[in-house]
Amino acid sequence: MPKRTDIKSILILGAGPIVIGQACEFDYSGAQACKALREEGYRVILVNSNPATIMTDPAMADATYIEPIKWATVAKIIEKERPDALLPTMGGQTALNCALDLERHGVLEKFGVEMIGANADTIDKAEDRSRFDKAMKDIGLACPRSGIAHSMEEAYGVLEQVGFPCIIRPSFTMGGTGGGIAYNREEFEEICARGLDLSPTNELLIDESLIGWKEYEMEVVRDKKDNCIIVCSIENFDPMGVHTGDSITVAPAQTLTDKEYQIMRNASLAVLREIGVETGGSNVQFGICPNTGRMVVIEMNPRVSRSSALASKATGFPIAKIAAKLAVGYTLDELQNDITGGRTPASFEPAIDYVVTKIPRFAFEKFPKADARLTTQMKSVGEVMAIGRTFQESVQKALRGLEVGATGFDPKLDLNDPEADSILKRELTVPSAERVWYVADAFRAGKSVEEVFELTRIDEWFLVQIEDLVKDEEKVKTLGLSSIDRELMYKLKRKGFSDARLAKLLGVTEKNLRSHRHKLKVLPVYKRVDTCAAEFATDTAYMYSTYEEECEANPSSREKIMILGGGPNRIGQGIEFDYCCVHAALAMREDGYETIMVNCNPETVSTDYDTSDRLYFEPVTLEDVLEIVRVEQPKGVIVQYGGQTPLKLCRALEEAGVPIIGTSPDAIDRAEDRERFQQMVQRLNLRQPANATARSEDEALAASKAIGYPLVVRPSYVLGGRAMEIVYQEEELKRYMREAVQVSNDSPVLLDHFLNCAIEVDIDAVCDGEIVVIGAIMQHIEQAGVHSGDSACSLPPYSLPQHIQDEIREQVKKMALELGVVGLMNVQMAVQGEDIFVIEVNPRASRTVPFVSKCVGESLAKVAARVMAGKTLAEVGFTQEIIPPFFSVKEAVFPFAKFPGVDPILGPEMKSTGEVMGVGDSFAEAFAKAQLGASEILPTAGCAFISVREDDKPFAAQVAGDLVALGFEVVATAGTARVIEAAGLPVRRVNKVTEGRPHVVDMIKNDEVTLIINTTEGRQSIADSYSIRRNALQHKICCTTTIAGGQAICEALKFGPEKTVRRLQDLHAGIKA
């Protein structure tokens, strides 16, 4: 069946902001779908609220709406654009749920829109647990024993059939949100209550526990003619009980017999047919009991998922692209496989002659109160993938690509510790982010494979592989560097040992080890990912390293630019940096360079095989980058675009003679090194908050007397504000110095005077060494003290006087020229009245670059890449700051709901995982839309609770006045209430949590409050009001922890409900006019 001609335009729903369980893999799939459908001549309309994505670039679709993915908003877009079809399978759970809402509210029927790729009934059958269970029974497949509950009463009924331990999962949520494992009645009650609340249909599935079973996934693609292929089988290294997004996974499956594999393959095809997935990709998850071999179907996703992004990168088969084409009527045998240059059709199942390992990346250091144990609710924020010829090689490459300080299986445990044995038992039995290292420690401690298997239930095949690596390490420890000959070195490198790990074992430097290895002529070769196990030739340069005879890299002699990516997503370094890397690659390719991308994150667009000319899927570490440079000999390497990951390498790369283009490593150091930066600020006669550096507790206490409290304290060289705190008195400073000095490895702790009530400003600029052009000035809505990545911001500024803005522009230009910036630069400043303070300067791509590019209609990342490659800003044609005639607001999205016990308060340490953007003619409209996009539902009436710190009291009356005028009842604690009463406004007093009951938390629990404005100062007041914020989160009450946030909410409420939707392309045309 060739493509359908009865549909002309297709609406694609994106996934919205990045949250735990739904990361940038949906930018990758959405961008692919846009490309594939436009290639076929369809008009593509895209909705996505996340500005940091490639898919929302104006060139990706015919009409782009950066609007909230809520059915009412999408209905307005459908009314305006009149698409013929809706493709809901590219935007994760968000898009599926929105599509079902549109169907339920009759919007699709009203405007005659057909759902393609999956229909409402299919989605419902796969997602609705009781229908899914029944469907599996109909085709003779077993599901875990289970029951459905819509209330606590029903839940107890199911419990009687299933027994403890049991697994609880809410329907229509993703990443296992709200679910968990219950071992007793108390836990059962808590998890069920949370799950019923979080499921949009108030429905729970309660399953028998399969903990310790082996878990597998099949990635399947099916077309209209019932052709099916398995793209990839994936095996979870961690057994059942850990969410598959948090498990280490390996492809292809390693421990299945051929017979088992065929049974599972047939079962997964039967599942797709029964559920009714006519076209596109799905993944089916299975559990197998290691003792009896009983196989059960756990679940299936009738959409492109995180696993399909992994399967696409693992095999080179572009699932999302193929799925989009199947949705418009093609069949698999009609589509070509790009990687083999069309030598094979898409109906050939990929064959792979290597092993892929994925390891998740967690961010528990950001949430010290969170439970770091892994269960059925997903907690990881990113992942890294590695390719090797064996499991040993690929797992060791993945471990070093994670960037958690490991160079391989580094020991975690001091084996001489008297507690060592009990720590080991606990760490092996209860899975955590670090379990895989403890497995290696268990073998060092002399445990047998059988013992470790009993504790972990990790398949013995994997355990034997790790035990073998530990034995190799023990052997290396007994040798000296000179006694390692070519044969042994070759054997160790084939098993994936990194230079850094071997150097540590031998007690030499990594540099010494590398030169010894080069002397022995032990060098990696590069193999291609070609979907066909080298059976057909391939023109696509998608490479991984290994130690063998034949190298398939075949580098060209063209001028090349190499871009280092950002590695795994984490809080503080996410999709924004990937966006910059992709734009750099596009710009360099347009200018005739051959582009080389180095990255190891399988979720991203940067690791797509056609984003750059050559892709090296390798860890972004010194060893791996230097080897690629040796083979490719690039003209220039870009390190400023991937966040802190490549920046950390720039000094060492420069020493090794790698040509780093753009801002010099020395200039980067001048901006990052505190003392050198201070000298520059003084030379330019600019102002910084009073500050000092301290290397010990005594120095810190002395400095604090000179500077005065409150203080911001932090270690030097960090991204995302790790281990940063605001302290208000000496006791807090002492405690911080005892806990934080370990973070700094001999580098000092920095103390800054904290600017209370200051307005924070973010500036992005581009410089070519001669002239500086401001990309944008953004005013933060939260005052200084909230990390810039967590603060909402407005472009253009909404209340910053013009003369202050002009002064900021001048100061930024001075600093850019003084530092000799070539490329992008980001500056953070604070404004207190007429005083402007420089807080920090980052001569690199910042996380606001994508947002700014969407607002001003010019890709700063592309402009800056061209400047780095040697053009002037005049030659690029970007010489004038663009100030848009509309307002854009960026709002951050947080993962607090996933971490019970974590305080949802904003401070100097970054906690957000993603962002959304709202656009309006006024600041109020843009802010209101951004809140909606972030799923913060602003209340329109009810009772507002206000309790603010001393410094905010002058503003409390104004906010209260606004709320009263909008029809709210205002309640406040005693001190705040006095201020409001003094202004002649009606207010009801309520007890603080420490003042006896009934107090404010009782009101929150009884759902008597609809809006909370609660600002704090100092450790004690934060601790006292913790239960207010946590309960507000659990009861889904709009809550802000800054007075400026309260003022902005009042502005948005005055604006009233959102009325218009705007096309990005029209907004940009309006700027150019």
Swiss-Prot record:
Region (Carboxyphosphate synthetic domain): 2-403
Residues reported in the UniProt entry to bind Mn(2+) 2: E299, N301
Gene3D superfamilies to which the protein is assigned, alphabetical: 3.40.50.20, ATP-grasp fold, B domain (3.30.470.20), Carbamoyl-phosphate synthetase, large subunit oligomerisation domain (1.10.1030.10), Methylglyoxal synthase-like domain (3.40.50.1380)
Domain MGS-like residues, every copy: 936-1073
Protein name: Carbamoyl phosphate synthase large chain
Amino acids binding Mg(2+) 3: Q828, E840
Needed cofactors: Mg(2+); Mn(2+)
